Amino acid sequence: MLRPWLRQSTRAARSLPCCQCPRPYSSRLPTLTSPSSSVRRLQTSASESQDRVPLRKQLKQNAKALKAEKRQRRESEEASRQKWELTVGIEIHAQLNTETKLFSRASTSSTDLPNSNVALFDLAFPGSQPEFQVPTLLPALRAALALNCDIQPVSRFDRKHYFYQDQPAGYQITQYYEPFARNGYVDLFGYDGIAPEDGDHVRIGIKQVQLEQDTAKSQEYHPSTQLLDFNRVSHPLVEIITMPQIHTPATAAACVRKIQAILQSCSAVTTGMELGGLRADVNVSIRQRGDTEGVHQYGGIGGLGQRTEIKNLSSFKAVEDAIIAEKNRQIAVLESGGVVEGETRGWTIGSTETRRLRGKEGEVDYRYMPDPDLPPLLIGADLVSELANTLPTSSDELIGLLTGKEYGLSIEDAKPLVELEDGARLEYYQDVVDILRDLQQDQDPKSRGGLARVAGNWVLHELGGLLTKADLPWDAERVSALSLAQIIDHVQRKQITGPTAKQVLAMVFDGDTRAIPQLLEEENLLLRPLSREEYVALAEAAISQNPQMVEQIRTKNQLGKLGWFVGQMMRMGEKGRVEAPKADAILRELILG
């Protein structure tokens, strides 16, 4: 590495005028002895710096500087938030859970070969006509009802005209003017992940829910090849349009997450963002707080700033990050005296800026018009009533029930019980609680009051931990609800200790098919209480091991150190027979008198 540098320095030295040297210039390499010569000297050893900073001090300085930078950034963001108001509206496109396409009998399977599930109408063959598939309406209605929408008895289909290779007809069939559902809402709570500044509860209005076609799936190959799979053309979609009532990026992401969970809970969709079954577009605008003079109006809300649309966001994090980036961009434009343009922008995962895709096409550019080939869609009140009565209980109601007086679970336990395995674990938990309450009927009502909380801990953390460790999916048959309830029952009756109960659970999890009472008896795991004399003997043996700690407890009242002696007693005693509260009481008696 040094040789090229040396050669370069030598060549440079040859070309220098030797004005300091009294000898005439020679074409040969001169001997450079003057300290004022401009030739660089190669230094092979580090010079001693008198102000060298020790590594530890340097790390502390760097950490302090980073902390100060973060604090300054937070203060800047807070100042910006106080001055500027963010407004966000969301459009969610979700693939419906149907076997056929919206206007043809072709299959909606996503696993078949490309271009193998395509009808003539999907490819816009001349003379082909749309044929509305009635079964596709059912999951759409379930979605709209779960979002608290008013179902319209009459709705109509419109053509949205644009030219792109993924839409062979040159237009998309949608419901722009008369959608089948309007005026819904979604409630967001703290446990949904909304921003702290939004409080404990936010209600976001749903302007409308409409049926529409999906487009073809395209794959680009560098430099100029693009392949199209028309299997996805005319796949039934619902487009869910929220009101522009969101004011923080975190709440926007929480809204998309909550809507996806609602759609999945009512079987309206089969896949979410993680598999491409749901996509989101966000409309972002900025205005000064308190400014009602804005000229723009969206969804009936006026006084807003110029909006930009960010298309095709495919994850919750992308929704939040893209909004943050676009908010910062618009604020920078406005603070520099510029004007925000109405346009469509894109977002790349990992980026810190949105990018311009095209100028925003106005509604008139799409040339919306009623579809002349499709009759009005009539929806009967009896169908709506039947579907409404068969909807599952909402997650918010379930969480409210689980955190209420009857079960007393924390939000941290209630939420995963509702969300995991599409409610399968919640059903298992309910079975465990019901069996356990029956087993504990002869016990004190006060102690029975906490059974639901205890069962929640065992279902989520103990059994769930075994599944996670073994990298296995949920299986309610692996440990039956009866077996788990009997294990908890024995713990509550103090017939086995907590560690023994976990050992028994692991044995059943690993395939032991014996009934719990039989297993405990045959493995000699039942707790046979120690006598007072046995506790005293163990305590005296533990005390003799560390008289210095005993003195600290007596003279300095360091009662926390009693736990060490309790642990020693449990290790010295027969496994599972020493009860910590009783051991602690004996130790206090012997040490403190």
From Swiss-Prot:
SUPFAM superfamilies registered for this protein in UniProt: GatB/YqeY motif, Glutamine synthetase/guanido kinase
UniProt transit peptide range: 1-49
Gene3D superfamilies linked to this entry: 1.10.10.410
Stored SMART domains: GatB_Yqey
Entry superkingdom: Eukaryota
Single GO cellular component term: glutamyl-tRNA(Gln) amidotransferase complex
Subcellular location: Mitochondrion
GO molecular function annotations of the record: ATP binding; glutaminyl-tRNA synthase (glutamine-hydrolyzing) activity
InterPro entries membership: Asn/Gln-tRNA_amidoTrfase_suB/E, Asn/Gln-tRNA_Trfase_suB/E_cat, Asn/Gln_amidotransferase, Asn/Gln_tRNA_amidoTrase-B-like, GatB, GatB_Yqey_C_2, Gln-tRNA_amidoTrfase_suB_CS, Gln_synth/guanido_kin_cat_dom
Major location (coarse): mitochondrion
Feature: compositional bias, Basic and acidic residues: 66-80
Entry keyword Transport: no
Stretches the record annotates as Disordered: 27-80
EC number per UniProt: 6.3.5.-
This protein's UniProt keywords: ATP-binding, Ligase, Mitochondrion, Nucleotide-binding, Protein biosynthesis, Transit peptide
Catalytic activity: L-glutamyl-tRNA(Gln) + L-glutamine + ATP + H2O = L-glutaminyl-tRNA(Gln) + L-glutamate + ADP + phosphate + H(+)
Residue ranges with Low complexity bias: 27-42
Record-level GO BP terms: glutaminyl-tRNAGln biosynthesis via transamidation; mitochondrial translation
Similarity field: Belongs to the GatB/GatE family. GatB subfamily.
Function: Allows the formation of correctly charged Gln-tRNA(Gln) through the transamidation of misacylated Glu-tRNA(Gln) in the mitochondria. The reaction takes place in the presence of glutamine and ATP through an activated gamma-phospho-Glu-tRNA(Gln).
NCBIfam families recorded: gatB, PRK05477.1-2
Assembly with partners or alone: Subunit of the heterotrimeric GatCAB amidotransferase (AdT) complex, composed of A, B and C subunits.
Name assigned to this protein: Glutamyl-tRNA(Gln) amidotransferase subunit B, mitochondrial
Species of provenance: Aspergillus oryzae (strain ATCC 42149 / RIB 40)
